[in-house]
Amino acid sequence: MAVYAVTGGAGFLGRYIVKLLISADDVQEIRVIDIVEDPQPITSKVKVINYIQCDINDFDKVREALDGVNLIIHTAALVDVFGKYTDNEIMKVNYYGTQTILAACVDLGIKYLIYTSSMEAIGPNKHGDPFIGHEHTLYDISPGHVYAKSKRMAEQLVMKANNSVIMNGAKLYTCCLRPTGIYGEGDKLTKVFYEQCKQHGNIMYRTVDDDAVHSRVYVGNVAWMHVLAAKYIQYPGSEIKGNAYFCYDYSPSCSYDMFNLLLMKPLGIEQGSRIPRWMLKMYACKNDMKRILFRKPSLLNNYTLKISNTTFEVRTNNAELDFNYSPIFNVDVAFERTRKWLEESE
């Protein structure tokens, strides 16, 4: 029976991973490692769940928290393209924090690491080039924001660490998973968009081109892919060692606006008029200045305007081929759960 650790386990994705691990037959103990205290800690009658408050940049505390762990699912990150955090803060957590986790793996002889990367480790790039493809599609990877850069660098770090020698001469095996736009209950961004629509009289004003298609994925299926990858990476001859996979399910691929309308229309949200691009650009520039001068974050800035209007569509089944992944939540269930959460959080 194994001991798993989930960094960022009190977060949006991490909590769902912990919930699914409770049903994993080969897991005896789950260590939930997060810098914040979980206000609603998950409990179980069949698994030992230990919550450890810890900064992943503090090597000594990380080492202590991970001592005796067999496998790490590393989800801890600062996900920010809105200006809430400084560039240094994002790099410290996303890149250097991952360095700390890898160092602990080497020092403690932890053989398996599943890393939560991001689609932004690939794109959309700073040129606004569309991406339609899979894990092996050629694309100009040129990050346009420090968040994307930090996830790209951390993914490369984790991939390079695969097959490296750790304590007692054993080998470390790693795998990276790249979620596209995650949605589901607990998604703060979806909640913000919903609240904005309510404030505007149940109207969603459109800001994104209809042909800017983005792949989306439900949080429960992303969590399931992590749990499944954690199982398969331990098999001798596993195909996933040293590989990266996009996270996907059967959620609609469409523009951000159209996706939100599909999700929220049963909640009474109606389509509004399209805001002209010149006006969006003007507000984006204004918000960028506020961020620079006053550290004021904003959902609309030049970076978010560009990436939301740049197609990033994943077409792959590599996770199915290599570790037998298939979504465990269909779209109807995913939408129903998300809508219920939005209604209850009003």
Swiss-Prot record:
Its EC number is 1.1.1.145, 5.3.3.1. GO terms for biological process: steroid biosynthetic process. The keyword Electron transport does not apply. Keywords: Early protein, Host-virus interaction, Isomerase, Multifunctional enzyme, NAD, Oxidoreductase, Steroidogenesis, Viral immunoevasion. Pfam families: 3Beta_HSD. It comes from the Viruses. Pathway: Lipid metabolism; steroid biosynthesis. One of its GO terms (molecular function) is steroid Delta-isomerase activity. The keyword Amino-acid biosynthesis does not apply. InterPro entries: 3Beta_OHSteriod_DH/Estase (IPR002225), Lipid_A_modif_metabolic_enz (IPR050177), NAD(P)-bd_dom_sf (IPR036291). It catalyses: a 3beta-hydroxy-Delta(5)-steroid + NAD(+) = a 3-oxo-Delta(5)-steroid + NADH + H(+); a 3-oxo-Delta(5)-steroid = a 3-oxo-Delta(4)-steroid. The active site is at Y147. NAD(+) binds at K151. Catalyzes the oxidative conversion of Delta(5)-ene-3-beta-hydroxy steroid, and the oxidative conversion of ketosteroids. The 3-beta-HSD enzymatic system plays a crucial role in the biosynthesis of all classes of hormonal steroids. During viral infection, steroid production contributes to virulence by inhibiting the host inflammatory response. Belongs to the 3-beta-HSD family. This is 3 beta-hydroxysteroid dehydrogenase/Delta 5-->4-isomerase. It comes from Vaccinia virus (strain Western Reserve). The lineage of its organism: Viruses, Varidnaviria, Bamfordvirae, Nucleocytoviricota, Pokkesviricetes. The gene is OPG174.
